[in-house]
Structures are given as structure tokens and as C-alpha cells.
Amino acid sequence: MSLSIDVTSLPSISSSIFKNESSSTTSTLSGKSIGRNEQYVSSDIEAFNKYMLSKSLEDIGPSDSASNDPLTSFSIRSNAVKTNADAGVSMDSSTQSRPSSNVGCDQMDFSLTKGINVSASLDSCVSISTNHKKEKSKKDKSRKHYPRIEADSDSEDYVLDDSDSDDGKCKNCKYKKKYFALRMRMKQVAMQLIEDL
């Protein structure tokens, strides 16, 4: 049995910071692509400082700050700057104050390509070879080979009388002596077989 698992590609996460208004995030999982576009406001340093200084400490929330983690350091979103347009940061002026170079806006590319190949095959070969001598059964072992019964008559002209015949089955038999010798021998063989059993 062989089991092989092949992972062709591990998850790879790449992030680059660009100064662009729109960012496309594409997630690829097993050949399926999901794309979405989100609008971001450029992180102009001077405008950001003015905006943060114009707000009180109680009004500053998590949406007003950016993380130092390059994977999650997005620019300030539009809903974070709509509250104070006098600070110089707005959706209309953000495109003009933004340079055309592709630096500053977050772009996160997360691609997951995973191939799993499981091959389980069970190859079994069973070979049974039996070579044994043919053993004789107990009956064959106990069987005795008896000598061949042969009886010769002294006189071939002897005719069996009806009184000596077995139920009249051997009438006028000229081999009476041979017949009686054969019958006596058969009785002995039958008695010996009974004793052996």
C-alpha cells in the first residue's frame, strides 16, 4: 500500500504599498478567483498630520490610525475623512494631491494554490502452492493383499450331484472339487476380513 501526498504550492502572501486610489484584492483558491475593489484615500503626510491634530483625543478611533504591519497598513479610508473636510483632506482633493507614481497605497495579493494528490493502491499477491505426497487412507493401509485363489480339479469328468449343490444353482457341474475348494477359500477370506475390521 502506497500513499503519496503532493502539495505543489504553499500559501504565499505578498504585500506592496502603492499610492493609488483603488486597490484590487484577488484571492485564488483551487482555481476560483474572487476579486473586489475598494477605494482608499491617499496617506498624504501633511494632510494626515493636520487631520489628526484637528481632532480631539476622544474622537480618534481605530479607523483613524494605520498599522505598522505591512500586510494590514491600509491608507485612511474615505469614511475616516468625511467628518472634517476643512483639514485639507477630502475625496475631491485627494486625487490632485496624489502623485502619479505607484507608491503609497496598499495592495495586498493573497494567492493560495494547493494541489493534493492522494494515490492509494493496494497490490497484493497471494500464492499458495501445496505439494504433498498422496497419503494412503487408513483403509488402504489396513487392506491386505490376499493371494489369488486357484483350485484345480483332479478329475474334469466329475459331475456334481444335486444334493451337494447350493440351492440347485450348480447342477451337473463337472468341477465339484474345484468348486468346493474355491468355496472354502472364500469363506476363509471372508472370515479374515471380518476379523480385520
Curated annotation (Swiss-Prot):
InterPro entries for this protein: Rotavirus_A/C_NSP5
In what ranges is there compositional bias, type Basic residues? Answer: 131-146
Where does this protein chiefly localize? host cell
Keywords of this entry: Glycoprotein, Host cytoplasm, Magnesium, Metal-binding, Nucleotide-binding, Phosphoprotein, RNA-binding
Indicate, by first and last residue, each region the UniProt record lists as having compositional bias (Acidic residues). Answer: 152-165
Modification type Phosphoserine: residues: 67, 153, 155, 163, 165
Q: Which GO terms describe its molecular function?
A: ATP hydrolysis activity; magnesium ion binding; nucleotide binding; RNA binding
* Post-translational note: O-glycosylated.
Give cofactor(s), names only: Mg(2+)
UniProt xrefs under Pfam families: Rota_NS26
Where does the record say this protein resides?
Answer: Host cytoplasm
Q: Which GO terms describe its biological process?
A: viral genome replication
Q: A Gene Ontology CC term for this entry?
A: host cell cytoplasm
- Annotated region Disordered: the residues are 130-167
Tell me the residue numbers annotated for binding Mg(2+). Answer: 92
The similarity annotation says: Belongs to the rotavirus NSP5 family.
What assembly does the database describe for this protein?
A: Homodimer. Interacts with VP1. Interacts with VP2. Interacts with NSP2; this interaction leads to up-regulation of NSP5 hyperphosphorylation and formation of virus factories. Interacts with NSP6. Participates in the selective exclusion of host proteins from stress granules (SG) and P bodies (PB). Also participates in the sequestration of these remodeled organelles in viral factories.
Role this protein plays: Plays an essential role in the viral genome replication. Participates, together with NSP2, in the formation of viral factories (viroplasms), which are large inclusions in the host cytoplasm where replication intermediates are assembled and viral RNA replication takes place. Orchestrates the recruitment of viroplasmic proteins such as capsid proteins to these factories. Participates in the selective exclusion of host proteins from stress granules (SG) and P bodies (PB). Also participates in the sequestration of these remodeled organelles in viral factories.
Query: HAMAP family from the entry?
Result: ROTA_NSP5 (MF_04092)
- The protein depicted here goes by the name Non-structural protein 5
Organism source for this protein?
Rotavirus A (strain RVA/Human/United States/D/1974/G1P1A[8]) (RV-A)
What taxonomic classification does the UniProt entry list for its organism? Viruses, Riboviria, Orthornavirae, Duplornaviricota, Resentoviricetes
